[in-house]
């Protein structure tokens, strides 16, 4: 099926996730299939939890030619202290140019499914700062996670959080985050 789908110019990769335990990194079939993505210049989107982020780094090490997009800031909970597995993996991600962070899922990380997730960048800065520091302006992309995000905050709030945060980084960084990086990746 991968050969059939990858023949279409709009097919850019696959998204996978939903593991209760670790990623199947040591399974030969899984490794073979991941290598096929890299061979076809396709990306792997990972929908994983904060505790699984170190495994995304291991994939990046094993497959340096594969673009790996980590979805929803790796579903890190919006509370301090941040999980050590997440903070260590964010620091390690700096060394892997094939790892990309989709900055989304922030309001969901608050757990406030009654629509009252906080607005503005300030409540999320302790998550956004280490991500921006590790991934830089070239390896982050915007994601809304709409319509799921609507349970936690209106779309305007979701957009406003990252717009406020990235606006202070300059027009070029903001343009890369919202548009150009996604077009390039």
For each feature predicted by the language model, list its residue ranges.
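Catalytic pocket-lining loop regions of alpha/beta-barrel enzymes
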Residues: 12, 23-141
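Glycine-rich phosphate-binding "P-loop"
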Residues: 8-25, 147
